[in-house]
Amino acid sequence: MLKKTFAALALGTALLSAGQAMAAEYKIDKEGQHAFVDWKISHLGYSFIHGTFKDFDGNFSWDSAKPEASKISVDLKTASLWSNHAERDKHIASADFLDVKKYPDAKFVSTSVKSTGDKTADVTGDLTMHGVTKPVTFKATFNGEGKDPWGGERAGFNATTTLNLNDFGIKGPGATSQTLDLDISVEGVKQK
């Protein structure tokens, strides 16, 4: 009787395990310049300033059969901001805005992924920036996955969101500069 019970338990466990999707782990390919964290903010309501953060790292888990089980974590060095204008970058990095000396890091950790279409999802998580943690939702698009020419496997995504800087204790220079658009493009290398 004990043998039959154990065999049934083992078979049930095997069937349950086979039915569960296994998310693969990916490292964001920043070193190969296949990942970007770009931003855009209004300049006096007349135009937009575009920039990027050059120093960040992260990883994500992904299973195309079960995207809701995906997770992502990104760490960013705020002093790595770049807008192609050294004096402006210095001002944005100052205590007037990002205060990168006091707040050198920003971090996003997902808490949920909700599919919104065949290749789209809302990725919600906690964004910590300027010493404040707030929930943020990114609109994400799955670009594709497959083998690369170097024998590895990759998956790629784009994600966008708009942040209200006041929510993070950052005072923009005027009413037209209170929101910041983030556009993230990542390609991850599957970890073995």
Swiss-Prot record:
Keywords: Periplasm, Signal. One of its GO terms (cellular component) is periplasmic space. SUPFAM superfamilies: YceI-like. The keyword Acetylation does not apply. Disulfide bonds: none annotated. The keyword DNA damage does not apply. Residues 1-23 form the signal peptide. Its main location: periplasm. Pfam families: YceI (PF04264). It is found in: Periplasm. PANTHER family: PROTEIN YCEI (PTHR34406:SF1). Belongs to the UPF0312 family. Type 1 subfamily. HAMAP family: UPF0312. This is UPF0312 protein PP_4981.
